[in-house]
């Protein structure tokens, strides 16, 4: 039931038709976020693999990025936009939280999204298609695990009734943390050559950097922070894969 709640929460696929999930389970959705990465990463990688057979790789990468956007309903991208607007335009904790809750997109959010997807597209088009697919499957799950550690290291910055999702995530138990780690690391261990495993360090470092920023300026996290952290961790993973690839070849 917890996995189903996570699939319902983090995607726009009709998993809600399977069963009616009680609200209490949505407090644990982050526990299974890396498992959801298997699905969303699989959709993105599968789209790239198939479309690259009959389309130029530049277009295939665009199709792959669009496929995951449709699968997730741009949930994480919404977080990235609000994060950029809040931290870019906010001068105090309260101002940052107020801007992040505003549904309108600002200049910082637009620029952040443009730079993010421009760089992502550039990075993925320079990789071979098999490596790009393996990196996507690996990076999605591992970056979700890294981003999930926000709930274990920071308090929630708002009151529960002020949350967009109307839920505050529970922290992971040691057993759940181990399960999430295995779910995040397994695709990378199975699909990428050992020389690329060094890329796993980049999302961990990105998480530490962002967590420190949130602790200093927000004294906590929000749901938008989780989405932004995932995307930025994933970006750092692909960038490192690209650096290793270009040096090897």
Q: Can you say where each PLM-predicted feature lies in the sequence?
A:
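Hydrophobic alpha-helical transmembrane segments
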Residues: 1-73, 89-91, 102-103, 108-249
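Glycine/small-residue-rich loop that forms an oxyanion/phosphate-binding "nest" at active or ligand-binding sites
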Residues: 78, 89, 98
